[in-house]
Design a protein with these regions (language model features):
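Charged, low-complexity surface segments at secondary-structure and domain boundaries
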Residues: 40-48, 76-78, 154-165, 217-218, ...
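Modules that initiate DNA replication and primer synthesis
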Residues: 9, 14-17, 24-25, 114, ...
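Metal-dependent DNA replication initiation modules
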Residues: 1-3, 9, 17-18, 64-65, ...
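Signature for HUH/AEP ssDNA processing cores
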Residues: 1-113, 122, 194, 206-208, ...
């Protein structure tokens, strides 16, 4: 793990430690009760602690040798393809030329069966549900990098390794979709199948943090997972907060509230 962490840093991929997986359990204090095992930061400020300093990275790895590696997105933009739904959404957007271009940039398979496509950084917001199962991770967001361990027992793994494939520019056609001003999410469906109607929530011009923090607590009390809550708050923030909070602020709200649930 250390060798890969040092490679990422040497090649300009800003990283920070995320909690790891040991014996099918998160290394955080919640252990097997963690609702986002192996995916959340093991530093106080999360992506803001990301570093390219090999000394810092060695220190992190020595402190928690089981830590996963998290990429602080921004200088690198990631297309997050969530399982079969995401694959189908992406395929519906592709022609032969687009598909061929995507095959030239680094790609990793996630431990949960999805994919991450890595591109040169571009000015674009973090987007949850740009299309069903398709998210964009940019500044303020993060993804877990190979060879980190997933709760499934599988490791994240590159099938197009950045040691051989250079980061390509973020596709213009995908950027156009990402910057479309039309609402991208009207409903978020929780894993339980329960829909959250975004349009039923009034516009939040002020007290955004308090409103989203209150909603976050309600969702935790209803037994929702960190992933569900993050997706819901991101969608509400994008569609109903005027102006929207930074993605890092949403992440901070979720992790702050999660300490009490």
């Amino acid at each position: 793990m250390l060798d890969w962490a040092l490679w990422f840093a040497h090649n300009g991929w800003p990283i920070f430690p995320a909690h790891g997986i040991v014996d099918r359990s998160c290394t955080c204090r919640k252990g097997p009760e963690c609702s986002s095992p192996g995916k959340h930061p093991d530093t106080r400020r999360g992506w803001k602690d990301a570093s390219l300093d090999p000394r810092q990275i060695r220190e992190w790895c020595a402190k928690n040798p089981h830590a996963n590696i998290a990429l602080a997105c921004g200088n690198i933009t990631v297309l997050d393809i969530d399982g079969e739904k995401g694959r189908q959404s992406l395929e519906s957007l592709l022609d032969d030329d687009r598909a061929a271009y995507l095959r030239t940039t680094p790609r990793a398979r996630t431990g949960g069966g999805g994919w991450h496509l890595f591109f040169q950084g571009v000015e674009v917001k973090n987007l949850v549900g740009m299309k069903p199962g398709l998210d964009i991770r940019s500044r303020g967001g993060h993804v877990i990098l190979p060879p980190s361990m997933h709760i499934s027992g599988k490791r994240y793994a590159f099938d197009r390794c950045p040691t051989k494939h250079k980061l390509q520019k973020f596709p213009k056609w995908l950027l156009k979709i990402a910057k479309d001003d039309k609402p991208r999410i009207q409903t978020v469906t929780l894993l339980s199948g329960e829909p959250v109607d975004i349009d039923s929530i009034p516009v939040i011009p002020e007290y955004r943090n308090n409103t989203l923090t209150s909603l976050c607590g309600k969702l935790f009390r209803r037994g929702r997972t960190v992933e569900e809550i993050s997706a819901t708050l991101m969608a509400i923030n994008e569609a109903r907060c005027k102006p929207p909070l930074d993605a890092s602020d949403i992440e901070k709200i979720v992790w702050s509230v999660s300490r009490y649930h």
